Amino acid sequence: MKLPKLSAQKKRPEEIIAELKRHPAIAPLIEGAEVIEYSAHVIPEAGYEMMPKLTADGLMVAGDAAAMCLAAGIWLEGVNFAMASGMYAGEAAVEAIKSGNCNASGLAGYRKRLENTFVLQDHKKLRHAPHLVLSDRVQHL
């Protein structure tokens, strides 16, 4: 659910989840279940166009902080991007430290790794998908 719609309903996220749990299609599936833990946070819907610069001197940005999430309503993908970008950041850090160059140019291997894998390839390929899925035309079918 997009933030403006949530705000217009004047309901907290946990109230909406409670309503969902009472829905006739859901309630029988979770009858007798116990909530062990609850958490919620805003998921970035920025996509490829809003992705920040991924490196600077002594710095690499990964996961949600780098808008590496494909989020469009019921479709959400991001844990795989966070894990992979973290791994590639670690590899690039080792490489930069070994070379003695931890400035942006020394960390360029990070972006190269991302570009050569599903992380940035998927973001580039699907960069228009969130706009389509979240469009008024699709949301009001």
Identify what each model region corresponds to.
Residues 1-42, 77-80, 95-99, 111:
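Conserved FAD/dinucleotide-binding core of flavoprotein oxidoreductases
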Residues 41-73, 138-139:
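FAD-binding beta-loop-beta segment adjacent to the flavin cofactor pocket
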Residues 53, 62, 66-97:
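A conserved active-site cap/scaffold subdomain adjacent to cofactor or substrate pockets
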Residues 1, 6-9, 37-38, 45-47, ...:
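Aromatic-enriched hydrophobic runs in primary sequence
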Residues 69, 87-140:
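Active-site-proximal substrate-binding core of FAD-dependent oxidoreductases
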Residues 7, 50-53, 73-81, 101, ...:
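Alpha-helix capping and helix-loop boundary segments enriched in small/acidic/polar residues
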Residues 14-17, 77-83, 120, 128, ...:
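Generic alpha-helical propensity signal that fires on short helical segments
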